[in-house]
Amino acid sequence: MSGTKKVGSAGRFGPRYGLKIRRRVAAVEAKMRQKHVCPVCGRRAVRRISTGIWQCKKCGAIFAGGAYLPVTPAGKVAKRVVE
């Protein structure tokens, strides 16, 4: 995997775009690639399939979420209003 010590996976951009933006991209990608909690079975086994599409490796549940995280701040508010 390409990367650097300072910006990790955003090292693929080389010197372009500036350090601050590359650090921000690296932080978002790190959050996106970690395992998340499944809303169906509760296990930490959710991975991103595509933009906004998430799948639990344990129970096989496929659901829509945010582009980079399965639960967005707006989604949390909407869920609270519905309940």
From Swiss-Prot:
Keywords, ordered alphabetically: Metal-binding, Ribonucleoprotein, Ribosomal protein, RNA-binding, rRNA-binding, Zinc, Zinc-finger
Stored Pfam families: Ribosomal_L37ae
Free-text cofactor note: Binds 1 zinc ion per subunit.
Binding site for Zn(2+): C38, C41, C56, C59
Cofactor(s) demanded: Zn(2+)
Molecular function terms, GO-annotated: large ribosomal subunit rRNA binding; structural constituent of ribosome; zinc ion binding
ZnF (C4-type) residues: 38-59
Claim: Zinc-finger is one of the keywords in the record: yes
Domain of life: Archaea
Gene Ontology biological process terms in this record: translation
Cellular component GO terms, alphabetical: ribonucleoprotein complex; ribosome
PANTHER family cross-referenced by the UniProt entry: 60S RIBOSOMAL PROTEIN L37A (PTHR48129), LARGE RIBOSOMAL SUBUNIT PROTEIN EL43 (PTHR48129:SF1)
Entry-linked NCBIfam families: eL43_euk_arch, PRK03976.1
Subunit structure: Part of the 50S ribosomal subunit.
Described function: Binds to the 23S rRNA.
Family: Belongs to the eukaryotic ribosomal protein eL43 family. Putative zinc-binding subfamily.
UniProt protein name: Large ribosomal subunit protein eL43
